């Protein structure tokens, strides 16, 4: 019986300490105000896999299957 009382007291103490600790709150409104740090890599770049791009002499990989 003493073990049950001791376990209950320790459990309640742990719950009380956990409730007293500050929680990390996520501020959703702040996330919308942050600047966007993602970069669109397709913007402004020519399509390297396009056949016209390779025929114009702009092929940066000359041995891509032709060697």
Swiss-Prot record:
The keyword DNA-binding does not apply. Residues 1-20 form the signal peptide. The keyword Secreted applies. GO terms for cellular component: extracellular region. Residues 35-67 are annotated as: Disordered. Coiled coil: none annotated. GO terms for molecular function: integrin binding; toxin activity. It is found in: Secreted. It comes from the Eukaryota. Changing residue 67 to S: Abolishes the ability of the protein to interfere with the binding of host integrin to fibrinogen and platelet aggregation. A motif (Integrin-binding motif) lies at residues 64-66. Salivary gland. Residues 35-54 have a biased composition (Acidic residues). GO terms for biological process: suppression of blood coagulation in another organism; suppression of platelet aggregation in another organism. Inhibits collagen- and ADP-induced host platelet aggregation by blocking the binding of host integrin alpha-IIb/beta-3 (ITGA2B/ITGB3) to fibrinogen. Inhibits the intrinsic blood coagulation pathway in the host by blocking the activity of host coagulation factor XIIa (F12). The Arg-Gly-Asp (RGD) sequence serves as an integrin-binding motif and is required for blocking host platelet aggregation. This is Ayadualin.
